[in-house]
Amino acid sequence: ETGRIHHGGNFQAMAVTNAMEKTRLALHHIGKIIFAQSTELINPATNRGLPPSLAASDPSLNYHVKGVDIATAAYAAELGYLASPVSTHIQSAEMHNQAVNSMALVSARATINSIDVLSMLVATYLYNLCQALDLRALQAEF
């Protein structure tokens, strides 16, 4: 109505940066839960009668999902690394003409990486679940 435009100059896009950081942290927590469940599934002390490492044959010779467990641990650790904030790494640019710069794109790219890692973690967990289900079916008595 007044003919004036008020612009806050929000080129830093901290709202987007922070939203992506919180999203990555949530993905990390989901990954930690899946890792814990996967660990309990392959551990004979917590899996209610399934063989160690979900081995279908002799558990002392067959370490079926040991490698998968190592991968899930690596994925969970990587999710923790990726959950770190990027907003603390803002640098001055243009000979200090731009004192603060947007980290929104960097944060979004890190979130995409987190989604990829979480997808691999979920895939390994689903593999373990399928193996456990097959072993339970072999144990079933009718």
From Swiss-Prot:
The record's listing under InterPro entries reads: Aromatic_Lyase, L-Aspartase-like
Q: Spell out the family assignment given in the record's similarity comment.
A: Belongs to the PAL/histidase family.
> Which ranges of the sequence are coiled-coil?
none
| Any one GO BP annotation for this protein | cinnamic acid biosynthetic process
UniProt-annotated location(s)? Cytoplasm
Q: Which Gene3D superfamilies match?
A: Fumarase/aspartase (Central domain) (1.20.200.10)
Under which EC number(s) is this enzyme classified? 4.3.1.24
One GO cellular component, as annotated? cytoplasm
What pathway or pathways are given for this protein in its record? Answer: Phenylpropanoid metabolism; trans-cinnamate biosynthesis; trans-cinnamate from L-phenylalanine: step 1/1
The main enzyme category here is: lyase
UniProt function note: Catalyzes the non-oxidative deamination of L-phenylalanine to form trans-cinnamic acid and a free ammonium ion. Facilitates the commitment step in phenylpropanoid pathways that produce secondary metabolites such as lignins, coumarins and flavonoids.
Domain of life of the organism encoding this protein: Eukaryota
Assembly, in brief, is: Homotetramer.
Posttranslational mods = Contains an active site 4-methylidene-imidazol-5-one (MIO), which is formed autocatalytically by cyclization and dehydration of residues Ala-Ser-Gly.
State what protein this is by name. Answer: Phenylalanine ammonia-lyase
Q: What keywords sit in the KW lines?
A: Cytoplasm, Lyase, Phenylalanine catabolism, Phenylpropanoid metabolism
The protein's GO terms of the molecular function aspect are:
phenylalanine ammonia-lyase activity
Per its record, the protein catalyses: L-phenylalanine = (E)-cinnamate + NH4(+)
State the organism of origin.
Agaricus bisporus
Which amino acids does the record list as binding (E)-cinnamate?
66, 94, 97
Q: Do the record's keywords include Plastid?
A: no
